[in-house]
Amino acid sequence: METLAAIIVLSIGLIGMAVLMSNMMTGGARSRYMSEGAMLASEKLEDLERYPAADPIVAVTSGAIAGSLSSDITASVTSNGSTDSVDYFDTVQLSVSGGNISETSSGKDASGNTNFTTITHAPTGEVTSSIVTTLPAPSADTLTFERRWTIEKDAPVGGVRRITVLVTLTNPVVVKSVNFQMSMVRP
């Protein structure tokens, strides 16, 4: 009888340890994806910050807000006599295969056409770049993130703009979705 009780107590303890280990593995993976989301949000904020205030990419010319965090928005923006087609979203793929680290991001060429630039870093130090017109098919290890951003005029006070970037992992390899949002205020 005592042996049976000891086996039951031991079994419960081992099952508890297995559940704990599973949760630790999932939490560790989710932390990795949150960290990558934070890096991509920060990268986009820095990218948008480099434009002059009157550039169509960051100008809010009609209404109080440009862009959307809930859907992909493209707008025709005129500022300082220049009219540009501006996307308030992009896609970034990160992949590690064969020792190479690749990042593919979407953008527009001089004619306003969407293209995808892939930059690959090899272990030898070689860096290659390629541009294609369609998003490359993801491999099994590819993480695909979607970034959307808004630019708010006179928020939180007059004379400044608040830029908010939302990064979402679109092919989650973990059960819980991964979203990361970051904002900055600039004149």
Model-flagged regions — what are they?
Residues M1-E43, Y51:
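Aliphatic-rich helix starts adjacent to a transmembrane/signal segment
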Residues S35, M39-P187:
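Low-complexity, Gly/Pro-rich coil/beta segments used as flexible assembly/activation regions
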